[in-house]
């Protein structure tokens, strides 16, 4: 009953759902960092880029503007690369960006291979299997085209973000972390 109420509330309040999703994504990133350190941030980046690419084709309206659901997850990617840059250096941040890029390419290849498998035609599951196959094909056939453009934008913007973060750090020293985080992220958008 509470789950139904909450679901209906969020369906009818997309901006609150967006904020909840954003906070959940950033919280999971922090949790992974707290539990696993640098490796946790690398996992968070790879996971967020996968979510961004899989959910990217889904469009919705937030604050009256049409947007892709995938953009929500870029907040945690920028956050994670900034934390990596600050605490582990430019090389580690760039390595995490490259890992996210490669994980997405692997996903495209493996999901494309999965589409080649024919659904079962066993009497008890043939209709279900065909329906799932068709739904899967709808998402996966669109995803590679979406991911290729997204990956290029991701790679360029993240590399620039890491570069800008360290260029600002070189000028300000250890002071003004807020400036490095915000200026590098805003300029790389």
What is the meaning of each model-derived region?
Residues 98, 102-125, 154, 158:
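Transmembrane alpha-helix/helix-exit interface in multi-pass inner-membrane proteins
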Residues 54-65, 87, 109-123:
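Transmembrane alpha-helix boundary signature
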Residues 114-145:
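Membrane-interface interhelical connector segments
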Residues 1-84, 91:
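Hydrophobic transmembrane alpha-helices
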Residues 171-187:
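Internal alpha-helical transmembrane segments of multi-pass membrane proteins
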Residues 48-56, 104-110, 189:
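Aromatic-anchored segments of alpha-helical transmembrane domains
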């Amino acid at each position: 009953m509470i789950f139904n109420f909450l679901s209906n509330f969020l369906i009818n309040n997309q901006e609150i759902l967006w904020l909840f999703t954003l906070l959940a994504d950033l919280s999971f990133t922090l949790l992974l960092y707290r539990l696993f350190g640098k490796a946790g941030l690398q996992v968070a980046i790879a996971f967020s880029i996968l979510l961004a690419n899989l959910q990217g084709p889904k469009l919705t309206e937030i604050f009256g503007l049409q947007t892709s659901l995938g953009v929500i997850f870029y907040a945690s990617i920028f956050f994670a690369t900034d934390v990596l840059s600050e605490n582990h250096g430019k090389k580690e941040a760039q390595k995490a960006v490259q890992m996210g890029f490669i994980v997405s390419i692997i996903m495209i290849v493996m999901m494309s291979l999965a589409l080649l498998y024919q659904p079962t035609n066993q009497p008890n599951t043939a209709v279900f299997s065909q329906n799932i196959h068709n739904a899967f094909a709808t998402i996966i056939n669109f995803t590679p085209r979406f991911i290729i453009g997204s990956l290029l934008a991701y790679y360029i913007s993240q590399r620039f973000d890491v570069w800008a973060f360290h260029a600002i750090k070189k000028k300000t020293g250890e002071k003004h972390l807020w400036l490095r985080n915000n200026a590098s992220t805003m300029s790389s958008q």
